[in-house]
């Protein structure tokens, strides 16, 4: 049998890439964990956080947010990922705190913070976020959609799901000349950004430059980017990439936020 022609090969590669991306974006398997809550009735205490999003209301995440235990947080690489939770997992614990199935349907939350370990306490008596435990410290409004306030802690099952966002990805440029710190937020699809590259200007000499993750979802470049239009390539944990060309005009200023393309 003759080998396929180049156009056919390109089509096959494209189909393979699409299937791989669809598989990566599909919901993962259910895993047992536990959940608590923090931040107050209006979730104001969840603002800020180890992902660097600051005001999660303004970043589009609302109150459906969670702080992850250290083993799940991955030093910030899980920031922006989405998880579906349902109360009453198989990992043990008191399920009486769960709302009835008809009332307590599953919820989808975004990882926006770290639940720090407390090695002074055992994992089943306050050290909920100690390694190797899988734990969600939910915003209070999110917790109350699946469990009763008085329960405090409940067993849950969770799985990774694709993030659904309104509008495009957001790029907030902070820092100063030669220290550009770009916060990437409102990321759809896998949600967890694992790599960012920036290109300044549009001339022939313009080259993509890899950025280094500084903390959370703040990405750093030591190049002089002032006075040039900026393009960004964002790659998520499932190895999918989206390019936003000239998302920031040449006259951009530090402190501004720009909206680019989105994962679909």
From Swiss-Prot:
Record keywords, A-Z:
Cell wall, Cell wall biogenesis/degradation, Membrane, Secreted, Signal
Which CDD domains does the record match to this protein? DPBB_EXPA_N (cd22274)
- Tree of life domain: Eukaryota
Q: Where is the signal peptide?
A: 1-24
* Domain Expansin-like CBD span(s) in chain numbering: 178-260
Question: Where is the protein found, in the record's own terms?
Answer: Secreted, Cell wall; Membrane
| Entry annotated with the keyword Secreted | yes
Q: Which GO BP terms sit in this record? A: plant-type cell wall loosening
Query: Topology relative to the membrane, per the entry?
Result: Peripheral membrane protein
Asked if the Swiss-Prot or TrEMBL record annotates the protein with the keyword Transmembrane helix, the reply is no
List the GO cellular component terms: extracellular region; membrane
User: Which residues are in the Expansin-like EG45 domain?
Assistant: 48-168
Classification via InterPro entries: Expan_Lol_pI (IPR007118), Expansin (IPR002963), Expansin/allergen_DPBB_dom (IPR007112), Expansin_CBD (IPR007117), Expansin_CBD_sf (IPR036749), RlpA-like_DPBB (IPR009009), RlpA-like_sf (IPR036908)
Family under the similarity heading? Belongs to the expansin family. Expansin A subfamily.
Tell me, in a sentence or two, what this protein's role is: May cause loosening and extension of plant cell walls by disrupting non-covalent bonding between cellulose microfibrils and matrix glucans. No enzymatic activity has been found. May be required for rapid internodal elongation in deepwater rice during submergence.
Question: Mind telling me what this protein is named?
Answer: Expansin-A21
Q: Which organism is it from?
A: Oryza sativa subsp. japonica (Rice)
Q: Which gene encodes it?
A: EXPA21
């Amino acid at each position: 049998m003759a080998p396929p022609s180049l156009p056919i090969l390109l089509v096959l590669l494209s189909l393979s890439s699409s299937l791989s991306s669809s598989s990566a974006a599909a919901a993962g398997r259910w895993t047992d964990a536990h959940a608590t809550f923090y931040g107050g009735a209006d979730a104001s205490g969840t603002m800020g956080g180890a992902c660097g999003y600051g005001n999660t209301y303004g970043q589009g995440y609302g109150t459906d947010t969670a702080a992850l235990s250290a083993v799940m947080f991955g030093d910030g690489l899980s920031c922006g990922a989405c998880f579906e939770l349902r109360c009453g997992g198989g990992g043990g614990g008191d399920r009486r705190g769960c709302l009835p199935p008809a009332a307590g349907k599953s919820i989808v939350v975004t990882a926006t913070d770290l639940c720090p370990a407390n090695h002074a306490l055992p994992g089943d008596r306050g050290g909920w976020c100690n390694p190797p435990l899988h734990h969600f410290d939910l915003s209070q409004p999110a917790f109350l959609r699946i469990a009763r306030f008085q329960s405090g802690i409940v067993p849950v099952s969770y799985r990774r799901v694709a993030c659904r966002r309104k509008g495009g990805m957001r790029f907030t440029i902070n820092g100063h000349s030669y220290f550009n710190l770009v916060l990437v937020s409102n990321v759809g699809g896998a949600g967890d950004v694992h790599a960012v590259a920036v290109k300044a200007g549009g001339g022939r000499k313009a080259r993509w430059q890899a950025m280094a993750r500084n903390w959370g979802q703040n990405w750093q470049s030591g190049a002089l980017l002032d006075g040039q239009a900026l393009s960004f390539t964002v790659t998520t944990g499932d190895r999918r990439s989206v390019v936003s060309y000239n998302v920031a005009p040449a006259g951009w200023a530090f402190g501004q936020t720009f909206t680019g393309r989105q994962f679909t």
